[in-house]
């Protein structure tokens, strides 16, 4: 390979050498200078460029500074405008939030008032319902007591009717059927006619019954009648009223004052609350002390009397009835005398309850005489007078 420079002796022509040519500065022609707009000549222009270089640089820097400041001012103005807009929007939003807060508070207050009124109305309805229920229960209780009393009376009337049939008349209920020896007084107990008439002009017990004459003298006690009229204006079962306080003291208390004081108090409370029940019982269900197993042939289903102990008086006698206090399952057997005393008091309370409820449509005087008759029954029952049972 070939390397290096060629030599002249190898047949090649010698290299050309650079010949220095002197340069002459030639100025532009006149026409060219005119076309350039009267620019200075080249040497003068170069001198001007050399002198104006730092000034141009300072001019550029000042221009940059002025443009930068202008940009900053515009940016500051823009930011101020944006800040003003944001503050304005924020103020509007604050006002809207405040308005919504007021609306929410108003709604909460209205909701609270509505809830309170609803609860108050609900409590009022519940209270009225409870009062109506209590009144209904009280009326139901009283109605049941009346029904029980009427059933007991119906049972007693049925017993009287059955034992007074033509085939088997009840001679004790019809004294005219008794023989003269049975109907008359016992020997050794005869009284003078005038003395007997003077001692009992109104009632005379014959064969276990009270016979009332057809005509009786009546006279209204003004004090008692005034107390009754004052009670009748506003009838109540409160024992503090003068009328009921007198009846309790003179009739109800003594009539229900039995030997067994504790049970007597319970019976009195049950009678006042109208929760006492009197039930007739067959003799075979009684706790027998002395049992007479011979059937007497009665058509009412009772056997011969069975002796037992009265729970109120403590006496051993034939107990055809028993009492139950309230909802208790316990029963207490009572004698006919105790039953008559309890029944007399129950009849009195039933009548004054009818007056209290407005069921008695009478004037004051007939009502007063009916109450006087019921008080008379309590007094007689306390003294031991009662209808003899079949």
Curated annotation (Swiss-Prot):
GO molecular function: guanyl-nucleotide exchange factor activity
Biological processes per GO annotation: protein transport
Keyword entries, A-Z: Coiled coil, Guanine-nucleotide releasing factor, Phosphoprotein, Protein transport, Transport
Coiled coil ranges: 73-161
Annotated positions of the Phosphoserine modification: 168, 179
Composition-biased stretches (Low complexity): 40-58
Stretches with biased composition (Basic residues): 184-194
Region described as Disordered: 1-60, 166-194
One Pfam family here: Sec2p
Function (record text): Guanine nucleotide exchange factor (GEF) which may activate RAB3A, a GTPase that regulates synaptic vesicle exocytosis. Promotes the exchange of GDP to GTP, converting inactive GDP-bound Rab proteins into their active GTP-bound form. May also activate RAB8A and RAB8B.
Subunit description: Interacts with RAB3A and IHPK1 through the coiled-coil domain. This interaction is competitive. IHPK1 kinase activity is not required for this interaction.
Recorded family membership: Belongs to the SEC2 family.
Protein name: Guanine nucleotide exchange factor for Rab-3A
Species of origin: Bos taurus (Bovine)
Phylogenetic classification of the source organism: Eukaryota, Metazoa, Chordata, Craniata, Vertebrata
Gene: RAB3IL1
